[in-house]
């Protein structure tokens, strides 16, 4: 039996906005994910803490954003809030998060969702270039992270990766290791 795939969308969510929810819903729908765990970063190492709302408040705001107001269509049940980051040592590193997530969800497969800008700078993250060893990626293009940049980043960090041509949904795929891939 193949494991079910769960999306993981991390971020400070300071504040949560409709773009976060639309992105998570679109990825869940396009890739037929079981659900997407929205994971507020407890103590982000790349961002100064000035102006950062407390972790518990950001979690509450995110949970509130997923609640369905009266007389509205139901929110997407595939979106769930996870507080796992709050249980881990600080600062919050994606490597630690994915490692712990995999321990707790051994029968499921993670699909880490991140923006093109973040993907281009994985080499600055704690064990960032090792992340393809423990998770698959969905890289969401932004205005500065076009297809050429995606290909260049893959080639620079993982020269043995195999990149496919865009499919019918205009998704590129890169097989980074024998077991992990990256969609753009």
Write out the residue ranges for each language-model feature.
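Nucleotidyltransferase catalytic core that binds NTPs
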Residues: 1-184
């Amino acid at each position: 039996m193949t494991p079910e795939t769960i999306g993981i969308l991390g971020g400070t969510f300071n504040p949560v906005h409709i773009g976060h929810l639309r992105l998570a819903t679109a990825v869940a729908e396009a890739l037929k994910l079981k659900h997407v765990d929205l994971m507020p970063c407890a103590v982000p190492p790349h961002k100064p803490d000035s102006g950062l709302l407390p972790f518990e408040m950001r979690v509450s705001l995110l949970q509130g954003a997923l609640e369905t107001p009266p007389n509205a269509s139901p929110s997407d049940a595939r979106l769930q809030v996870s507080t796992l980051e709050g249980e881990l040592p600080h600062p919050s590193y994606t490597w630690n998060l994915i490692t712990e997530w995999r321990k707790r969800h051994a029968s499921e497969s993670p699909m880490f969702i991140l923006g093109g800008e973040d993907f281009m700078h994985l080499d600055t993250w704690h064990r960032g270039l090792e992340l393809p060893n423990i998770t698959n990626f969905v890289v969401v293009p932004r205005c500065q992270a076009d297809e050429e940049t995606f290909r260049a980043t893959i080639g620079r960090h993982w020269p043995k990766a195999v990149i496919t041509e865009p499919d019918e949904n205009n998704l590129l795929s890169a097989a980074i290791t024998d077991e992990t891939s990256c969609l753009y």
